Amino acid sequence: HIDWKEYAKIYEPDQDSFLFLDALEKEISFIQQVQPSLLLEIGPGSGIISTFLSRLIRTSNSVATIAIDINMDACLVTRRTYQQNGTPYTDVVRSNLLSGMASRLQNKVDMIVFNPPYVPTESEETFLPSIESAYAGGVRGREVIDRLLPDISSILRTGGVFYLLLERENNP
């Protein structure tokens, strides 16, 4: 459903996306035990990860999905991915990480997934509302990750889970 021209504006699912999907699929028994009713994907790009999870989780319960991306094109493509895959109970928000959302989500999110921009780049690139923001991780590829991490514990409910894809250069 995504036109090849749109991939010039959003993060095209790549090896890291498919690795993340494989890892999440292996976790599905645990994820179903968590019984997430609110799934948050930060930086969805095309929306394939939250669409995939919603379908897997839906077998055991209904799940509402919120996707947040700084890139408006990614928001539009994610919404279309949800619609074309019949992903129910979704909302797509254009925002820089959790700006303006953290207080409303406090202690409400059951599951967070984030395939962050982790490529080491100049710091300024991490704030661009365009395709560059999809890979620009700043110094050591950690700046975007480090801006988000302080908010995670406040938005996760007790027993909630956070899945974050990292790579060696990020010094996890």
What are these regions (language model features)?
Residues 21-125:
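Conserved SAM/SAH cofactor-binding pocket of Class I
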Residues 68, 138, 165:
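Active-site-adjacent beta-strand anchor residues
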Residues 1-31:
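Class I SAM-dependent transferase core
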Residues 9, 42, 137, 141:
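Glycine- and other small-residue-rich loops at beta-strand/loop junctions that grip anionic moieties
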Residues 116-144:
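Mobile active-site "lid"/loop adjacent to the S-adenosyl-L-methionine
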Residues 5-6, 92, 126, 130:
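Residue-level signal for pocket-adjacent positions within structured domains
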